[in-house]
Amino acid sequence: MSSVVARRFVKKINDHDVGGMVALMTADHTFVDSLGERFSRPAIERGWKQYFDMVPNYWVKIDRAFTEGKVSILIGRAGGTYVSGKGVERPENNWETPAVWVARTRDGKVAEWRIYSDNEPVRAIMRKSIS
C-alpha cells in the first residue's frame, strides 16, 4: 500500500496538482527538503505552488522503488527548467539531478515526504539569472 500511495503522490507532483497532493497528505504532513529543513501544512502547499511557478515543467522520474512496511524509498531523477521573474523558459536554464525520496505513509496518505538530492545545478542557474 505504501508504494501505491507514494507513486500516486509522484503522479500528482508530475501533474503539478497541488490539490491532489494535499488530498494525499495527512493533516500533520511534513516535507523535508534536501538541506534537512522541515515544512508543514499549510506552508508546504504554498511552497509547492511557488516551486511549480519557478520550475513550471518540474518532473520526477522514478527508476526503482523499495518498500518495507509504511516506508517507500524511491530512486530516480528530478528536473525541469528554472524560470526567472520574467517567466520565460530558456533551454540553458534546464537542469536534471539524481534524487532519492522517502515516503512515510499512514492510513493511506503521505505523512512525510523527504528528498535527498544535489540542488546545486538549479542553484547555479538561479545565481546566473540574478547576475
Regions picked out by a protein language model, each given a short descriptive name:
Residues 4, 57-59, 94-97:
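Short solvent-exposed loop/turn micro-motifs enriched in small/polar/acidic residues
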Residues 67-71, 103-110:
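Short, solvent-exposed coil/turn segments at beta-strand boundaries
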Residues 77-107:
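Exposed beta-sheet edge and beta->alpha loop/turn motif
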Residues 111-131:
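Low-complexity, intrinsically disordered terminal/linker segments enriched in charged
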Residues 1-27, 129-131:
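Short, low-complexity N-terminal intrinsically disordered segments enriched in polar/charged residues
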Residues 25, 78-80, 117:
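Short beta-strand segments enriched in hydrophobic/aromatic residues
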Residues 18-22, 26-70:
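A solvent-exposed, acidic/Ser-Thr-rich amphipathic alpha-helical stretch
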